Amino acid sequence: MATYHATTDSDKLCCHKKAAPVNSAKISLIIPVGPDDSSWNSLLEQIALFQAWFAEIWLITTSTDSADFECWTRRFSDSEIIHWVHTIIGRGHQLNTGARLATGSWLWFLHADSRLSHDAISALSTALQSDHDSIYFFNLKFETDGPTATRLNEWGAWMRSHWLRLPFGDQGLCMSRETFERLGGFPENVPYGEDHLLVWQAHKQRIPLRAIPATITTSARKYRSDGWFRTTIRHLWRTAAQSLPQLVALLGSRLR
């Protein structure tokens, strides 16, 4: 696999890539990978089953060790669609980097610890054929690697995303390139909640958010390692702290 170096305004990228024609009607899958995160291996195992459906797969990582990735390229029938990119730490920056490099007309931002199903892929495929202007998200389910109390968090995520129209990044946000560019990308100057702030920006621009009638699963390991109550309260507090000024700004723009 060939290697090249590309330079952006903010950093240098090291990518493992082969040039390949891409069907722009397909999806570019963008997966940010954090330091010492190996959960993407299990995700790629699932993605390999649906690889024909993607224009390309971008793993945007802060690690320079691509040994495991090189092994994965041999498990894809077309190794040219999967790419490994090294960039600086920061989830918002990683997501924007993937979007800049992607060539598909649809951008699907997926967490490395997400788990997919055939039903989820099929439901998203159907939805994308009917509406090109919305941001799509899935229902959320937690894996069994955490406390059983995370079932309450699933319920809370459903209410937040369906009633308040505030889905988070672990619900697999997918949108057209035009919509992403209209939003201006993910904010990079925040310590957390870049996905949350992007959704608020969508509300300000009256961009619809639509639920996919399917579920993706995410890891509950943080609820186990940090404690269910502590983690839940921390998420609620951070969400409220970010939401209040955004809500005030949204109401202000509506009243002008």
Q: Which stretches of residues belong to each language-model region?
A:
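The conserved acidic donor/metal-binding loop of glycosyltransferases
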Residues: 111-115
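Acidic donor-binding loop at a coil-to-helix junction in glycosyltransferase catalytic cores
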Residues: 192-198
